[in-house]
Regions:
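Catalytic cores of extracellular degradative/oxidative enzymes
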Residues: 97, 124, 139
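Juxtamembrane membrane-water interface segments of multi-pass membrane proteins
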Residues: 1-21, 36-50, 69-88, 103-118, ...
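Alpha-helical transmembrane segments of multi-pass integral membrane proteins
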Residues: 26-32, 62-66, 87-106, 129, ...
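General N-terminal targeting signals
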Residues: 54-57, 135, 141-142, 165-166, ...
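Alpha-helical transmembrane segments of polytopic membrane proteins
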Residues: 1, 52-63, 117-130, 181-194
Length: 224
């Protein structure tokens, strides 16, 4: 999506390949390295968890920073003056993963369950939903050969999503009554941008349902 929005190719293909390899290596290392070090040295459970968090959160977030720089450089080469909704969702998804991963790592160090909980919402809920919308807002209008149905709903889904807390993949956290009530309100309101984006994409696809159904990627994005 970023390449199509730019000059038809990524600003750096080498960057994309290298970051993909490093991301996979870090993910595998975070699972295997604590076990190997635990066999070689007398590591406590806390030290093993620290190593795992270091690889899973902090180091991987640096890899995503390189991805984000590549995406920004690619989009800067675009022919039109308008940055598409798909690219905005992609920017926000990458930024959410970067900051959320840091929140989770330092929250674990400080033993702050509230910081870890917020980091999980950023790196999981915000990131995943934003990436789904990024793909859908790029693929569906092209498959339907129609513009996005409602610009207002696009802006609503983009802005409100990152001011609320999507109620997905939740985990327990210690908090006072005020924070619990505030969290419940934000999780309830979070359904609005998701519904707005879903309706917007669905109505766009109905403009040319045959074209969307004939393309598996567009159909999958619509159903997602």
């Amino acid at each position: 999506a970023a390449a199509r929005a730019g000059a038809g190719r990524l600003a750096s293909e080498a960057n994309a390949s290298l970051t993909a390899i490093l991301f996979s290596v870090l993910t595998i290392s975070s699972l295997i390295l604590p076990i190997i070090l635990g066999l070689l040295f007398d590591l406590s459970a806390a030290n093993e968890e620290f190593i795992r968090d270091l690889f899973m959160h902090t180091l991987r977030s640096f890899i995503i920073m390189a991805v984000m720089i590549n995406v920004l450089l690619t989009v800067s080469q675009r022919k039109s003056e308008v940055v598409s909704a798909s690219n905005w969702f992609m920017f926000m998804a990458l930024a959410s993963f970067i900051f959320g991963s840091q929140f989770r790592f330092f929250g674990e160090l400080a033993n702050s369950t509230q910081t870890v909980w917020l980091g999980e919402r950023m790196s999981q809920s915000w990131t995943i939903i934003a990436l789904i919308f990024a793909v859908a807002y790029h693929v569906v209008p092209r498959a339907a050969s129609r513009p996005i149905w409602s610009d207002s709903m696009t802006k609503a889904s983009l802005l409100l999503l990152f001011f609320t807390l999507p109620p997905f993949m939740l985990s327990p956290a210690d908090a006072g009554m005020l924070l619990e009530n505030l969290g419940a309100i934000l999780m309830t309101v979070a359904l609005l941008p998701i519904l707005a984006g879903s309706v917007n994409i669905l109505m766009t696809s109905l403009g040319n349902a045959t074209g969307v159904v004939s393309r598996p990627g567009a159909l999958a994005a619509t159903l997602a």
